[in-house]
Amino acid sequence: SMNTKIGDVWNSVPKEVDMQQHDWGVSEALRYRFTKELLGKASVSYDVRLPTDAELIGDGFLIAPSGDLKPERGTNANIGLMYDKKIGSGLLQVEVNGFFSYLQDMIRYTRNFVQGRYTNFGEMRTFGVEAEVKADVTRWLYGYVNATFQDLRDTRKYEPTSNVLNPSKGLRMPNIPYFLANAGVEFHKENLFGGKGQNVRLFTDASFVEEYFFDFEVSQYQEKRIPRSFKLDLGLEYSIMNGGLTFSAKASNLTNARLFSEFNYPPPGRAFTARIRYVLK
């Protein structure tokens, strides 16, 4: 339920909003262990996601209110396999998942000249697969790699509030990456410099996002694209007193690569941060 007043930069008189909605959802999941190392899992669900406060009433500046938003309704299915195996003193884990989603009344951010707002987009269908491998390579070295491919398509037959055929039906959804991958390596060692109660972590993480469209690809000459990106982070953590005192430092976007958000905004470039954490016991 919501009882409030909303307005935007164009309207000086706030509009009263008083509404109450009810809905339901259902889900079921199961898993089956084929062997000691191999686990299968599956789930189906009909979910309802209520709009958040930010989506409904905006932020009073860049995001205009949208008091008439409907909840998202999604029919989802997932199926996957997980392989766990001890290797020496460590663990090898391999996981593969496939997923499907049919979303109605999808809540999507739409940019305007001055203010953007969240609107109910309509219908969207998703097929996808994701895979991840994690392993303790040695007692002091850990690594992981994962990748996701997802095919999200507009399934609206008509344009909103009209009988005009939707020219983007069947096209890939814009502003959402369809292929992305991550990888990382971590070195960790206890009492590397002698003594007791110490731990050192040196880690690096890399992320890759393939080029994707800023808007619907309604023409083969569509050039509004969000470019391919690669980001590399490097961090160091040193703790003493059995984790009671921790010093950490991190370099984000170490190579100062040009990155862009899903709406083609450039985020900050290379950044360095440092933290000290003390735990009271």
Where are these regions (language model features)?
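Signature of Gram-negative outer-membrane beta-barrel scaffolds
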Residues: 1-38, 50, 159
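Transmembrane beta-strands of outer-membrane beta-barrel pores
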Residues: 1-4, 44-50, 57-59, 85, ...
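Residue-level signature of outer-membrane beta-barrel architecture
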Residues: 22, 30-33, 46, 71, ...
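Membrane-embedded beta-barrel scaffold of Gram-negative outer-membrane proteins
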Residues: 33, 39-45, 71-127, 148, ...
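Short loop/turn motifs that connect adjacent beta-strands in outer-membrane beta-barrel proteins
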Residues: 37, 86-92, 140, 190-200, ...
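C-terminal beta-signal and adjacent terminal beta-strands/loops
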Residues: 48, 99, 143, 202-281
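Gram-negative outer-membrane beta-barrel transporters
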Residues: 94, 98-102, 119-213, 255
